[in-house]
From Swiss-Prot:
Disulfide bonds listed in the record: none
One family name in Pfam for this protein: Ala_racemase_N
Protein name, entry field: Uncharacterized protein Mb1448
Biological processes, Gene Ontology terms: D-serine catabolic process
Domain of life: Bacteria
Entry's Gene Ontology molecular function annotations: D-serine ammonia-lyase activity
């Protein structure tokens, strides 16, 4: 989902596990709404920068353990997220902010170009694995590698995304 408003609608209609993939810059009102949602459902937010993670932690300090964080990885679309080799900076910001890091995610939007799904699927797999492996190597417990687009959903190798439906990520 892209907005807190979308999450509110889904939770109001029974969803109990939601992930806001669009980068948020959380203010006081958004923090209040996320806290209320976290009382009713499992909530995860994406972090694409160290600054964004720090802001999220500052705004949600009292609810940090109740809200999961996945770091957005740029797998070749170059729209948002960090390169796999930059993931540690964001992870440390997530940890310093007291947030609960559970994994990494990507959206291979470039897979929609003609003839690109196979190449984009491989880039997605490699980016998720490189980022997750770097985090695990320094002690971050990563339970989720989230990815997929319509063109790459069925192309993900066994060692790629652990899920394309957020519910499958362990907590």
């Amino acid at each position: 989902m892209a907005t807190i408003g979308e999450v509110e609608v889904f939770v109001d209609h029974g969803a109990d596990d939601v992930f806001i993939t669009y980068p948020l810059w959380i203010g006081t009102r958004q923090a209040d709404r996320l806290r209320q949602l976290a009382d009713r459902a499992r909530i995860a937010v994406g972090a694409g920068t160290a600054e964004g993670a720090s802001n999220t932690g500052a705004r949600l300090a009292d609810a940090a353990g109740a809200i999961d964080v996945l770091i957005e990885i740029d797998s070749g679309h170059h729209r948002s997220g960090v390169r796999a080799e930059q993931v540690l900076e964001v992870a440390h910001a997530v940890g310093e902010a007291g947030l609960h890091l559970v994994g990494v995610f990507t959206f291979p939007g470039h897979s929609y170009a003609p003839g690109k799904p196979g190449e984009a699927g491989e880039q997605e797999r490699r980016a998720l694995n490189d980022a997750a492996n770097a985090l695990v190597a320094v002690g971050f417990p990563i339970s989720c590698r989230s990815g997929g687009s319509t063109p790459t959903a069925l192309l993900t190798a066994a060692d790629g995304a652990s899920e394309t439906s957020r519910r499958l990520c362990a907590r």
